[in-house]
Swiss-Prot record:
The organism of origin for this protein: Sus scrofa
Protein name as annotated: Liver carboxylesterase
Disulphide bridges, residue numbers: C88-C117, C274-C285
One Pfam family named in its UniProt record: COesterase
Chain ranges for the short sequence motif Prevents secretion from ER as given in the UniProt record: 563-566
Length: 566
């Protein structure tokens, strides 16, 4: 375990502490009793009971490293669940950066990181003396499957304002969560199996917290949105949830889902000094490594950073979801085409400028000069192969389509970032929404178009709807900020209402809200921003262009299959 002071939101600290019951909440779970705390928000009579760090699985240590999660051990005392759990192991420096961006904290908390991290946080506005049945919203955080944690997302405001039970879960990340040898010795997808285990825990226990196990909505952003999308496709998650929301990430996001990751496993073996005579030997070697040794290995892998100098086909900036035959039986494209998945009501959305600032900055795109010529853009698109998956021979055609209409190098840079946003998020999201709709499930789409007042000073003022920007609205941060503009407070209330209405009924619409059309053959969607309004055919032309380009390419040549043996 290691410590790092992180600037995090302790949203509860902004709350006033009036009107809560005299004694703190104690709730029974299948494993034992847990003690929480009450948090009251100004202007709202009903306090929220908060339980932080409730274990939903056994610590994944020793022989449970690279293994499916096991049920938590029971305890006979009252467990104190009033402080944040450790976050799963990850690069602490990069996590510091992202936490600073995604939380509005004034208070510096010392956060722990540990391999023992399978905990969840519960925020319930229910009167625990009565048997309430409130809708449950289970949040899966983002971070490229290598970063993040539940403490960054305080569910108090959403729970209090919308009368829903919010659960923020954690799951193993990086090597701990997604290391795969492609065989039975380490299938991978451990982090997703943790998510499934958390959903089982919710089914078994959430009624005691005033939640309805028959009304569970899973929602997540970025890799959390991709996780939601994977769970929609997974037979293991059947009947564990009833509605789903993917914000800026789906199972067709190329960087996050691969058939196998044997090539990355090979790289890990070399860096770890492990023999790979057999998978069993390799996995045994990695299980012997200490937590710190695996962290050191994580730093050497340089996750989330694109290599703009080496061979991008040999670079592994992500340890993604893999086809393991269990959680994910086939590639998402096949499962979607066969219409064989959990056809629950589904909201799929993207932000207006997914590659506006945060992602190119984190991934190390050389754009500091703020301008770009066509040749460099074409080269950058090819260097982005691990996340864009565009064959080298198509890169000039693509950059010409997007950048060819202007000679202004500043505009070219902006258009290149639009191209990246479309390839990585826009096109996959629309494709998933269409397939979901065609399988007969109620589907809704949105595009978020607002620049939060929380935005980093470093982010150019022109960037509106950057990756992650909707999170502030979804969790009601502006309602606690005090000095947030009125339009932002109003927008946040609208977004929370849409999300919670959807959690209640599978339809986001309700009294006093702009109409959000269902995503049908006309492809109506909602533009969410200062002027929230319906529009049609989100990214329609762009999707047509990319589908046409990639299908022509696929028809031209037989697929090359490259095997990396372990």
């Amino acid at each position: 375990m290691w410590l790092l002071p992180l600037v995090l939101t302790s949203l509860a600290s902004s709350a006033t502490w009036a009107g809560q019951p005299a004694s703190p909440p104690v709730v029974d779970t299948a494993q034992g009793r847990v003690l929480g705390k009450y948090v009251s928000l100004e202007g709202l009579a009903q306090p929220v009971a908060v339980f932080l760090g409730v274990p939903f699985a056994k610590p994944p240590l020793g022989s449970l490293r690279f293994a499916p999660p096991q049920p938590a051990e029971p305890w006979s005392f009252v467990k104190n669940t009033t402080s944040y759990p450790p976050m799963c192991c990850q690069d602490p420096v990069v996590e510091q950066m992202t936490s600073d961006l995604f939380t509005n904290g004034k208070e510096r908390l010392t956060l722990e990181f540990s391999e023992d991290c399978l905990y969840l946080n519960i925020y319930t506005p229910a009167d625990l003396t009565k048997r309430g049945r409130l809708p449950v919203m289970v949040w899966i955080h983002g971070g490229g499957l290598v970063l993040g944690g539940a403490p960054m997302y305080d569910g108090v405001v959403l729970a209090a304002h919308e009368n829903v039970v919010v659960v923020a879960i954690q799951y193993r990340l990086g090597i701990w969560g997604f290391f795969s040898t492609g065989d039975e010795h380490s299938r991978g997808n451990w982090g997703h199996l943790d998510q499934v285990a958390a959903l089982h825990w919710v089914q078994e226990n959430i009624a005691n917290f005033g939640g309805d196990p028959g009304s569970v909505t899973i929602f997540g952003e970025s890799a959390g949105g991709e996780s939601v999308s994977v769970l929609v496709l997974s037979p293991l998650a059947k009947n564990l949830f009833h509605r789903a929301i993917s914000e800026s990430g789906v199972a067709l996001t190329v960087a996050l889902v691969r058939k196998d990751m044997k090539a990355a496993a090979k790289q890990i073996a070399v860096l770890a000094g492990c023999k790979t005579t057999t998978s069993a030997v390799f996995v045994h070697c990695l299980r012997q490594k200490s937590e710190d040794e695996l962290l050191d290995l994580t730093l050497k892998m340089k996750f989330l950073t694109l290599d703009f100098h080496g061979d991008q086909r040999e670079s592994h900036p992500f340890l993604p979801t893999v086809v393991d035959g269990v959680l994910l039986p086939k590639m998402p494209e096949e499962i979607l085409a066969e219409k064989d998945f959990n056809t629950v009501p589904y909201i799929v959305g993207i932000n207006k400028q997914e590659f506006g600032w945060l992602l190119p900055t984190m991934m190390g795109f050389p754009l500091s000069e703020g301008k770009l010529d066509q040749k460099t853009a074409t080269s950058l698109l090819w260097k982005s192969y691990p996340i864009a998956n565009i064959p080298e021979e198509l890169t000039p055609v693509a950059t010409d389509k997007y950048l060819g209409g202007t000679d202004d190098p500043v505009k070219k840079k902006d258009l290149f970032l639009d191209l990246m946003g479309d390839v990585v998020f826009g096109v996959p999201s629309v494709t998933v929404a269409r397939q979901h709709r065609d399988a007969g499930a109620p589907t809704y789409m949105y595009e978020f178009q607002y620049r939060p007042s929380f935005s980093s000073d470093k982010k150019p003022k022109t960037v509106i709807g950057d990756h992650g920007d909707e999170i502030f609205s979804v969790f009601g941060f502006p309602l606690l900020k005090g000095d947030a503009p009125e339009e932002e407070v109003s927008l946040s209330k609208t977004v929370m209402k849409f999300w919670a209405n959807f959690a209640r009924s599978g339809n986001p619409n309700g009294e006093g809200l702009p109409h959000w059309p269902m995503y049908d053959q006309e492809e109506g969607y909602l533009q969410i921003g200062v002027n929230t309004q319906a529009a049609k055919r989100l990214k329609g032309e762009e999707v047509a262009f990319w589908n046409d380009l990639l299908s022509k390419e696929a028809a031209k040549k037989p697929p090359k299959i490259k095997h990396a043996e372990l």
